[in-house]
Amino acid sequence: MAKELGVTCAKCAKRVCQPAIKANEVPSIDEAPPFCPMRLFPELIDKAVVEYDKPETREFARLASVQEFECYEWTEEGLRTRFPRIEELIQFANKCGYHKLGIAFCLGLWNEARMLSDILENKGFEVISVCCKVGAVAKERIGIKPEQKIAGPENWESMCSPIVQAEVINIEEVDLAIMLGLCIGHDTLFIKYCRVPMTVLAVKDRVTGHNPLAALYLSKSVYYGRLSTKRKKADV
């Protein structure tokens, strides 16, 4: 029995979703691979696109595309990029008319959170910030064993509480939440419980200076080569 194909855009070489055609032409999916979502789910795509007809959603999407456009410029040398993400954050928040911003950060990035808060305040925003250890709840509360504590079994260690972070952000009624360096998994919970518009300034990567793509760029090197090694069945 043939294996049912799933969506695999990452392995597509055709890119029919971004064709090199004129603006008045109609994109074709004739060359789309069988795993292309434009082949597999045309009705779903049509239904989802209708969401952009909602005025608030349409305007948000429009502003996001304008922001994308403004981050590039054509020069004599060709196309070049213009702004780092922190400047984009400021520009986009201004475009949206946001005034109050909320930073949910990892305590390990306290210095970065302070710097970010100062920068945003200097740009005229009201800024609140809440760290991951808010509540000072012991890790034992979620079933962590003494030997699983980073500080050691004999010491107190507060659990990271992204749910509390999210609820504080919610009750503060910020216009935009900014996630800064939350651990993997903790970021997932924050996203699940946050009920206001949210963006990510940086994610946690303890080895690469919070730049996880560095591991991909170095995945063929001696040190990171283990990332490209295929797992044997016995390792599963």
Predicted regions and their residues:
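An N-terminal assembly and electron-transfer interface module characteristic of large anaerobic redox
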Residues: 1-236
